[in-house]
Amino acid sequence: MSRTIMAFDFGTKSIGSAIGQEITGTASPLKAFKANDGIPNWDDIEKQIKEWQPDLLVVGLPTDLHGKDLETITPRAKKFAKRLQGRYGLPVELHDERLSTSEARAELFSMGGYKALSKGNIDCQSAVVILESWFEALWGE
């Protein structure tokens, strides 16, 4: 059975999202949700979850380059993951998101130049990078 996985790139002003299929190991950007100090409009997230019906949620875990928690943002991303699990009853996994934004910027720039580098596009592409990295870790690549 192939699972549908939804990923989130947590931020205090914007939360990017992506969807992917475990069988293909690929992901596509969905929507960037505006956040107020890290708190999204939960109704918008619920609509997306109902539409796509994922089996699992993956939240990017922000750390420094050595894999250590960042003082302010890491605990907030963990709290966001716990809220997702509590609200929607879906399993949630945290996944290392180191350098995902840099990779997302590079991919977007190669596809559309500076015009493609909007905040929402970057956040959603970061969620794609996080999810595809999660797939690679799942398969041991």
UniProtKB/Swiss-Prot annotation:
Gene3D superfamilies: YqgF/RNase H-like domain. One of its GO terms (biological process) is rRNA 5'-end processing. It holds the Pfam family RuvX. Its EC number is 3.1.-.-. Its main location: cytoplasm. It is found in: Cytoplasm. Keywords: Cytoplasm, Hydrolase, Nuclease, Ribosome biogenesis. Could be a nuclease involved in processing of the 5'-end of pre-16S rRNA. Belongs to the YqgF nuclease family. This is Putative pre-16S rRNA nuclease. It comes from Vibrio parahaemolyticus serotype O3:K6 (strain RIMD 2210633).
